[in-house]
Amino acid sequence: MPAARRRFDPVDHLLALDPGRRGIAAFFQPGGALRAARALARARTVLIVTGFIVADGMPETDGPPGAAVLGRALRQLGARVRYTTDAATLPTLAAALKALGEPADAFAYPDGAQAAREVLARERPTHLVSIERPGRGRGGDYLNMRGVSVAPWNRPLDDMFLLARRRRSSTERTRVSEPRPSQTRPPSVRAGQAPLATISVGDGGNEIGMGNVRGALTRQGTLMARIASVVRVDHLVVAGVSNWGAYGIVAQLGRLTGRPLLHTPADERRLIEACVDAGAVDGITRRRERTVDALDADTHAAIVALLGLSWGDPAPRGERR
């Protein structure tokens, strides 16, 4: 379709808002939320990872609300949904789920070099989703927006995404080679092991999935080149606040399925309050206050209200489920 005839997408325009002035226009992904929604619309088993701990014992308010809202929508569409995060973030995530009346089906990500393999083997997800979760940079460290390491407090949950990508690459190589029935598969690919679909949401460049736009990030200066994640995913959603990106996916799921899946502005206020009461802090101010990325609860509630208006705007032709 010619550019002049492309439909105005209100979800994209809301997600592209940049209240933190991070310059996300340089790496924003138009249509990202819709592509993620298409991938998730018929998901069977979803594992959602979230939680960004900015300092020892200080999980931030961005991430768990988005994970809870997206997980609820996917459960309403029939998927089995579980969550994993660091032990320090579990109370915040559980509080967000409780605020929505959702089961706290979450567990602390285990320690150990084989944790990613063990979790994926046990959970057997068809879709792996990250909402505001640190992804390693080129040097292997996890850095905040100031370039300071947060590795001591954030376990390497991105190992699961790296493993999923390696498995997909191995599977594709196996298919291309078209082995005879008598030939064995490479050790890294098990019989019947379907590739995972991977989706991520981020807002700063240092999260899981930002490897998709690393080239654009590194052109933003030396600091961004240091902190930019190398971890890639199938579908990346960039937003001014990561929670908004998750809400954008839910709004698009609603448009695709014709169902009102998004939470309400009142729910949003309760989510933020519940997370703060459970010990979460604002990721920018590092204060225990009812804000997310230095924006008050009313601002986030307004974004939810605006995204909710898009539900009556049908998805692009041919995209409804």
PLM-predicted stretches and their roles:
Residues 1-45:
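Positively charged, low-complexity intrinsically disordered leader regions
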Residues 205-321:
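C-terminal functional extensions of proteins
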Residues 79-88:
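Short internal beta-strands
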Residues 172-178:
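Short, low-complexity, charge-dense intrinsically disordered segments
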Residues 60-78:
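Histidine-anchored nucleotide/phosphate-binding helix
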Residues 97-120:
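A glycine-rich helix N-cap at a beta->alpha junction
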Residues 63-64, 127-128, 133-166, 195-259:
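Conserved mixed alpha/beta catalytic, RNA-binding, or beta-rich assembly cores of soluble enzyme
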